[in-house]
From Swiss-Prot:
The gene is rpsS. GO terms for biological process: ribosomal small subunit assembly; translation. InterPro entries: Ribosomal_uS19, Ribosomal_uS19_bac-type, Ribosomal_uS19_CS, Ribosomal_uS19_SF. Keywords: Ribonucleoprotein, Ribosomal protein, RNA-binding, rRNA-binding. It comes from Polynucleobacter asymbioticus (strain DSM 18221 / CIP 109841 / QLW-P1DMWA-1) (Polynucleobacter necessarius subsp. asymbioticus). Disulfide bonds: none annotated. SUPFAM superfamilies: Ribosomal protein S19. This is Small ribosomal subunit protein uS19.
Length: 92
């Protein structure tokens, strides 16, 4: 189920504060956050946010298409290395 429209988007207060400071100072360095659950707001456009994926912070550059999505969608937590190759290949 989606979030109720009357509630509005969720965004951590600490992240909003960091974004406001970065925009006021015209700071371009990434903003570190562990808040994967926060919704990307229009204020975030043009900023780089380093989102924690459980192991490291993945830099995510926010564009217009990302508004309304969650930060965690852009920092993958699982790495797929591929299935093991079948070594019993027989030629006929």
């Amino acid at each position: 189920m989606t979030r109720s429209a009357k509630k509005g988007p969720f965004c951590d207060a600490s992240l909003v504060k960091k974004v406001e400071v970065a925009q006021a100072n015209k700071d371009k360095k990434p903003i570190k956050t562990w808040s994967r659950r926060s919704t990307i707001l229009p204020d975030f456009i043009g900023l780089t946010i380093a989102v924690h994926n459980g192991r490291q912070h993945v830099p995510v550059y926010v564009s217009e298409n990302m508004v309304g999505h969650k930060l965690g969608e852009f920092a993958l937590t699982r790495t797929f290395k591929g299935h093991a190759a079948d070594k019993k290949v027989t030629k006929k």
